[in-house]
């Protein structure tokens, strides 16, 4: 039986969930943030140590200013309200993505949360904000070229991965996407090469603990060969 210690989650379907209920898009994101809090508890109970969530992609900047501002407001609130819970649960918080494109007050809140939790563990929560997988690989390639310019032939994948935003973290055992779409949408392209993939039609706010646990059980029973 496979161990599932690290999962990546593409939290999709907030807006479609609200449309079916006659609610505003912003209400969908609010419910989505609540679902993340619930899922962290489910994951902890199931023995998952690292959760990486795709909260805001580089492409999401194309959304309306109102929606983007509201998403950042939710993120600030999450950091403010949940930081004590993360500390109590001995959870390290990390943020990956182009944080310097974010509002300065949000950058500050991220830095404070990271500093407060950096010496905790064994659990880790990683939130990808203003993140794009291709941009991450390009940035890692630049780091790699600087570090190993005189010894390129002696360096390989392990050395390259040290320049990724997720350096020091295990690759995901599972990537789960809610909302029905069946693609990774630029989420962890380097790290997901041997991840098990699950696409559920359930919209993110509607995900239940029962479905989440069933997904983990199904993946635990898959035959993972890692190319062998």
PLM feature spans:
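Flexible, compositionally biased loop and terminal segments
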Residues: 1-228
């Amino acid at each position: 039986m496979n161990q599932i210690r690290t999962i990546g989650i593409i939290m999709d379907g907030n807006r479609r969930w609200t449309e079916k209920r006659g609610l505003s898009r912003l209400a969908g994101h609010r419910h989505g943030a609540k679902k993340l809090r619930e899922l962290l508890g489910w994951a902890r109970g199931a023995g998952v140590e690292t959760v990486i969530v795709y909260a805001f992609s580089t492409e999401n900047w194309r959304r309306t200013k109102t929606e983007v501002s509201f998403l950042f407001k939710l993120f600030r609130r999450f950091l403010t309200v949940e930081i004590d819970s993360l500390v109590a649960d001995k959870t390290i918080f990390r943020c990956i993505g182009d944080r310097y494109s974010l509002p300065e007050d949000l950058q500050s809140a991220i830095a404070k949360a990271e500093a407060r939790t950096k010496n905790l563990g064994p659990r880790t929560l990683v939130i990808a904000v203003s993140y794009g997988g291709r941009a991450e690989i390009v940035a890692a390639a630049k780091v790699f070229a600087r570090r190993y310019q005189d010894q390129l032939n002696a360096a390989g994948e392990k050395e390259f991965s040290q320049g990724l935003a997720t350096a020091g973290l295990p690759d995901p055992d599972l990537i789960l996407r809610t909302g029905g779409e069946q693609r990774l949408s630029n989420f962890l392209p380097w790290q997901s090469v041997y991840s098990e993939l699950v696409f559920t039609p359930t919209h993110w706010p509607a995900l239940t603990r029962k479905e989440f646990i069933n997904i983990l059980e199904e993946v635990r029973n898959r035959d993972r060969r890692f190319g062998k």
